[in-house]
Amino acid sequence: MTNDPTKSTNPFEILGFTPSFSITPDQVQRAYLQRLTASHPDLSGQSAQTLDPATLNHARDTLLDDEARANLMLEHLGGPSPKDHTLPDGFLMEMMQLRTQIEEELDPSNPDHAQARTQWQTWANAERAQTIQTLTQIFKQLESPNPDSSTDESTDSPEELKQSIRTHLNAHRYTQRLIEQLDPTYDPSSADF
């Protein structure tokens, strides 16, 4: 980690955070506004090294996006790269069945398609929330391991925990695509999966 955020490309460093998956949107927004204010030419002077707004915007957007922040954090911890496409056993078959069911239920010829869309959106949002909660718990184990804790029931090694994060992130991407499929403007003939 560099001490000078103007020389960094890491969103955590740019906004002055110690890398952590658990940072909140409020913390990100506050840090972003502080850096943006400090970088304003009227306040910082022309000679001061400042961060350009595009860099700050990118850092903020990355840290506000759960998946992007998790990938950044996993990279920071030395975990598997996004090129690792490991998925839970049976997951692809389940996704194929869900996609078929969603397409059938959202077909405009189905008289209940509007109600089905709402139900599937609720399901997808719950899946997303569960994934983020799971990732948060695993990252907490990696960020602050406490061998004396009686509440930590995990016996997984740090490498196994990192692989678990990658597997959850890969599954999360599929769920995100299902959420996109629920958009009323979604066109199955132009889908990229």
Where do the PLM segments sit?
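C-terminal accessory/regulatory regions appended to core domains
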Residues: 1-193
